[in-house]
Amino acid sequence: PVFVILQVVLAWRVYGYMSAVPVEIVTTWFSLIPVYSGTTSINLIGATLSTGIFAGIGIIYGHELSHCKGFAFLISRMTMALSGSAHFCYAHVYNHHLELGCEDDPATAPRGRTIYGHYALSYLGQSKFVYDMEKERLARMGKGFFSFDNRWIRGYLMSIPSVVLFFMAGGWIGVAALATVWIISNFELEALNYLEHYGLIRVKDQPIDYRHNWDNNTLFTSWFFIEIGRQADHHDRGETHFWELENVGAPNTGWGYFTMFALALVPPIWHWYMRKRLATWDTKFATAEAVSYTHLRAHETEADLVC
């Protein structure tokens, strides 16, 4: 409900901006906090950016619930739909958790790719996975692709109420505000995928192990991201609740998510920092097949540096 309310409040801000209500103090709270009528351009920009950031936090809870069944999974889909990414729930469970570290997993960033290139490639790759999965599933059931049984289509239909709300609040300005929220929140999601598995390689058909994750057990990361940094145990026991996840001694990048995110925003610094960590991983954790595979892919991933 909190994340639904956030969108409703932002839509109200858009409406206030578009209706040109005069900006003036109408009252104060506790004789300290002024309450204004109307919305300025700066107000709208700030409200949109902050809503996008908090919607990204909602995605963290959507991820947690995607590993549940029944009503909890539906809540996960609805939460992700607020960011235009309801497909994530199926892609995460049936693609990422099964194909971790392989080329078939769009959520795993290969070496050399930037966070910006990964954002688009991962989002589109996961959506395509669910598209293909549903196409095959419906064909086996003898049903057409354009069916209400298509969970890929239903996922995007779940986002329509948000689009309608913002269009009614402010026309295309409202839709632009919503699109900005989606861009920011999904960038946060893909940033987490980027930090959690960057450059780690699992040769296809090898078992998924602790070493195929960058763990993060820093205190603030654990509190703020509800233990999502304990990726190794999470991928080993996917249906385990976040408060039951343990530090299993998997490889780690040395800093909390906020610091690592700041480094990733500047690709040359990120690649410089991670080069040593990956070299250590190759020495201590990679199998002979993975090391050979790394060298074979080195030239392919160089092209991603321009992304």
Predicted regions and their residues:
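Hydrophobic alpha-helical segments, chiefly the membrane-spanning helices
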Residues: 305-307
